[in-house]
Regions:
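Acetyl-CoA-dependent GNAT
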Residues: 2-81, 85-90, 94, 98, ...
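Extended hydrophobic secondary-structure segments
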Residues: 18-21, 103-111, 132-133
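Preference for well-ordered, secondary-structure-rich cores of eukaryotic proteins
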Residues: 53-54, 85-86, 102, 109, ...
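Short glycine/proline-centered loop/turn elements that form peptide/ligand docking sites
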Residues: 88, 111-114, 131-137
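Short hydrophobic clusters on alpha-helical segments that form packing/core surfaces
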Residues: 91-95, 103, 114
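Structural motif
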Residues: 98, 116, 120-121
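Conserved catalytic-core motifs of GNAT/GCN5-like acyltransferases
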Residues: 104-106, 119, 124-142
């Protein structure tokens, strides 16, 4: 069976579907207002649609010569199908178009599956942010900071 897979700009009318995925995939999910703010500020936000259904998304922000990946998710029933890789490739291509020199992200140190996806895409572990993410038991978890070098950094 052939699937139709499209990566499209995120719009406000897609946020119900995006929020459903956010709540399903993140221990400390964004609130709808976070997505509203990102769209209002013109951040690079895309949704992956599989056969007309939102199956993933990402939001990234352009800074001075760098892009920061703010949030990224694929529904559990669409994971391990290359969708994350496809979205990352699109984000990297866009980052190159913006003349960014690097692409940055943070993720929970316990998120081994995502860590593998990012490392396979060429991201390097740069640093830890101690006690960055809240956990359901009221404690905190470290974040792994990762970077993908896109161009030659100035000396």
């Amino acid at each position: 069976m052939i699937q139709t897979i499209l990566l499209e700009p995120m719009t406000f009318d897609m946020l119900d579907a995006v929020m459903a995925i956010e709540l399903q995939t993140h221990l400390n999910p964004w609130q709808r207002r976070h997505f509203d703010d990102c769209l209002n500020h013109g951040h690079h936000a895309r949704v992956l649609q599989t056969d007309g259904v939102v199956s993933g998304y990402f939001v990234a922000m352009m800074g001075y010569e760098e892009v920061h990946l703010l949030t990224f998710a694929v529904t559990p029933d669409h994971q391990r199908r290359g969708h994350a890789r496809m979205m990352l490739e699109a984000l990297v291509a866009w980052s190159h178009e913006q003349n960014a020199r690097s692409l940055w992200l943070e993720l929970r140190v316990s998120n081994a599956r995502a860590m593998h996806v990012y490392q396979t895409a060429g991201f390097q572990k740069i640093a830890l942010r101690r006690s960055y993410y809240p956990t359901p038991d009221g404690l905190c978890e470290d974040a792994q900071v990762m970077c993908l070098t896109l161009g030659v950094c100035p000396t």
